[in-house]
């Protein structure tokens, strides 16, 4: 049975976390869940901090609501990141190449899955799939400097 390890290092201004689940697919998916989930938590924390400062008061119920929202946002964003990275890795393994087409297909699949889980209509699912594919493709182009 494969062993799992978790290690991390901190060096200014970079935080590095390595996850070894014994399988590349699981490694990438869990790593994406943790990193993108942290982005979701940070986003929610910034929003709630702004609201508390704008409102000018802080109560126990406000803190409880903020904590609950932090957890939900972290899981939602982490799940989205995990689905996207896992799907992109699977497509890469099937196609045997690593290019923008993988990002487009994975983005479309992730957009459709997240929309379907959100119990939206089928028109919205298609639109979210198109949006997910477009955003993932644009991100891939920017990251790989296809525009230069």
UniProtKB/Swiss-Prot annotation:
One of its GO terms (molecular function) is mRNA binding. Belongs to the Tim17/Tim22/Tim23 family. Plastid outer envelope porin OEP16 (TC 1.B.30) subfamily. The keyword tRNA processing does not apply. Signal peptide: none annotated. Pfam families: Tim17 (PF02466). Voltage-dependent high-conductance channel with a slight cation-selectivity; selective for amino acids but excludes triosephosphates or uncharged sugars. Non-essential amino acid-selective channel protein and translocation pore for NADPH:protochlorophyllide oxidoreductase A (PORA) and possibly PORB. Involved in PORA precursor (pPORA) import and thus confers photoprotection onto etiolated seedlings during greening. InterPro entries: Tim23-like (IPR045238). This is Outer envelope pore protein 16-1, chloroplastic. It is a multi-pass membrane protein. Expressed predominantly in leaves and cotyledons. It is found in: Plastid, Chloroplast outer membrane; Plastid, Etioplast membrane. Its main location: plastid. It comes from Arabidopsis thaliana. Residues 2-73 are annotated as: Contains 4 beta strands. Disruption phenotype: Strong red Pchlide fluorescence after 3.5-4 days of growth in the dark, and cell death after subsequent illumination. Conditional seedling lethal phenotype related to defects in import and assembly of NADPH:protochlorophyllide (Pchlide) oxidoreductase A; excess Pchlide accumulated in the dark operates as photosensitizer and provokes cell death during greening. One of its GO terms (biological process) is protein import into chloroplast stroma. The chain crosses the membrane at residues 75-91, 102-118, 125-142. Keywords: Chloroplast, Ion transport, Membrane, Plastid, Plastid outer membrane, Porin, Transmembrane, Transmembrane beta strand, Transmembrane helix, Transport. Induction: Transient reduction upon de-etiolation (illuminated 5-day-old etiolated seedlings) (at protein level). Strongly induced by low-temperature stress and weakly in response to osmotic stress, salicylic acid (SA) and exogenous abscisic acid (ABA) treatments. GO terms for cellular component: chloroplast; chloroplast envelope; chloroplast outer membrane; etioplast membrane; peroxisome; plant-type vacuole; plastid; plastid outer membrane. The lineage of its organism: Eukaryota, Viridiplantae, Streptophyta, Embryophyta, Tracheophyta. Stimulated by GTP. It comes from the Eukaryota. Coiled coil: none annotated. Homodimer and oligomers in membrane. Forms large complexes including TOC33, pPORA and OEP161 during pPORA import into plastids at the plastid envelope membrane. The keyword Membrane applies.
């Amino acid at each position: 049975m494969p062993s799992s390890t978790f290690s991390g290092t901190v060096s200014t201004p970079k935080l590095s976390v390595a996850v070894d689940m014994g399988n590349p697919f699981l490694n990438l998916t869990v790593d994406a869940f943790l990193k993108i989930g942290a982005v979701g938590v940070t986003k929610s924390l910034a929003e709630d901090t702004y609201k508390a400062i704008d409102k000018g008061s802080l109560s126990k119920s406000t803190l409880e609501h903020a904590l609950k929202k932090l957890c939900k946002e972290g899981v939602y964003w982490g799940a989205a990141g995990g689905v996207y990275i896992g799907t992109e890795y699977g497509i890469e393994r099937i196609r045997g190449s690593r290019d923008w087409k993988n990002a487009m297909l994975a983005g479309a699949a992730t957009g459709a899955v997240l929309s379907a889980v959100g119990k939206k209509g089928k028109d919205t699912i298609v639109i979210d799939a198109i949006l997910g594919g477009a955003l993932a493709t644009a991100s891939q182009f920017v990251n790989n400097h296809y525009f230069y």
